[in-house]
Amino acid sequence: MHCPICHHRAHVVYCAHCINTSPSLLLKLKLDLILLKDENKELNGKVEQILNEAMNYDQLDIKRMEKKKDPLMNSLMKLDVLRMKKNNNLIRHRIEQLNERIYSKRNHISELKVEIDNYKCYKVGTGTDKLREQVEISDAKNKLAQVSKICESARDYKLNLLNNWFVIQKLQDNFQIPFAIAFQPLISLKNFRILPLAITNDSINIMWKYISFFSDILMIKLPYTNKICEQPMFEFSDSIQTVVQRLIKLIINILQICRHLKLVPSTPMDIPWLLDQYDVDGLFYNMVKRNKMKCRSVSLYWTFGMLYSMVLDNMNNPQRGHPARRTAPPPTVTGPHDRWYVVG
């Protein structure tokens, strides 16, 4: 073929049909292909030999390598040397980094050792301070326990003197008046109907005096105080409703003191059941003797109005437990000088 521009001969190009159908063209091309394959095999063998010698050059004789001066082998050897130098440089740089890290860690360890020594000294000082503080706390607790025992002994002594002063005693031969205070009957819901109003009011006054002294010794504040001025019996003119109200306030104060002494629980109590079991005089006597009392728990606290209605029911009903009208009982008719005492 000739170039249509420069008219020089160029490579001949045949179509696929001519190559497959022309025997002369097919044979020539096949022979060329066989020659090329043979040349490639020879070149492949040489390349493999050169590569093998280049990889194992440290095991070959130096003189033999000098006799054979193949440029490909020399290039490969130089490439391998450069690669080894590069690896050596990387290893050297890595070693330097590790040395710097080891040096910094050594400095950090030495600083930590110094801090540990300082902390040990501080800990020893702190331990000594804590031990001294614990000793002081223990001494303070011992002193507080001793003071508490002294205060408790003084309180018990004062309460015993108070009991002896008011002559609180339990009578064995009287069912309606089982307890006495200052040689007078302790008021209760059972004997409220049979005692004269003057005796009832006088008994409540004495119980109020005792409760006031008792709360002063215990150093507690009561919910109610006795604000009514004391008068002689023949001049007393309070109504029965006022006496009942004072009695209810007295019951509330007694329960408050019993809660403080842990004779009854601080939770809401079934006060009607408690009064049915102990009555007012029983509550007062157990408070004086500091005896624990059994009681039932309820969900709500009793109010003054609820207690007032309940006390009226108990006083109006001699059998205690049956419904009755909620009116105050009529006072017993007494003379101005009708005053008597129960002597145990």
From Swiss-Prot:
Secreted among keywords: no
Gene source species: Saccharomyces cerevisiae (strain ATCC 204508 / S288c) (Baker's yeast)
Family: Belongs to the ATG14 family.
Protein name: Autophagy-related protein 14
Principal subcellular localisation of the protein: membrane
Chain positions covered by the region annotation Cysteine repeats: 3-18
InterPro entries named among the record's database cross-references: Autophagy-related_protein_14 (IPR023261), UV_resistance/autophagy_Atg14 (IPR018791)
UniProt KW Protein biosynthesis keyword: no
Any one GO CC term of the record: phagophore assembly site
Chain's role: Required for cytoplasm to vacuole transport (Cvt) and autophagy as a part of the autophagy-specific VPS34 PI3-kinase complex I. This complex is essential to recruit the ATG8-phosphatidylinositol conjugate and the ATG12-ATG5 conjugate to the pre-autophagosomal structure. ATG14 mediates the specific binding of the VPS34 PI3-kinase complex I to the preautophagosomal structure (PAS).
Induction conditions: Nitrogen starvation or rapamycin treatment rapidly causes a more than 20-fold induction of expression. The expression is dependent on GLN3.
Gene (name only): ATG14
Keyword entries, A-Z: Autophagy, Coiled coil, Membrane, Protein transport, Transport, Vacuole
Superkingdom of origin organism: Eukaryota
Subcellular location: Preautophagosomal structure membrane; Vacuole membrane
A GO biological process held by the record: cellular response to potassium ion starvation
Domain notes: Coiled-Coils at the N-terminal half are essential for interaction with VPS30 and VPS34 and autophagy.
Coiled-coil regions listed: 25-156
Complex formation: Component of the autophagy-specific VPS34 PI3-kinase complex I composed of VPS15, VPS30, VPS34, ATG14 and ATG38. Interacts directly with ATG38.
UniProt topology in membrane: Peripheral membrane protein
Cited Pfam families: ATG14 (PF10186)
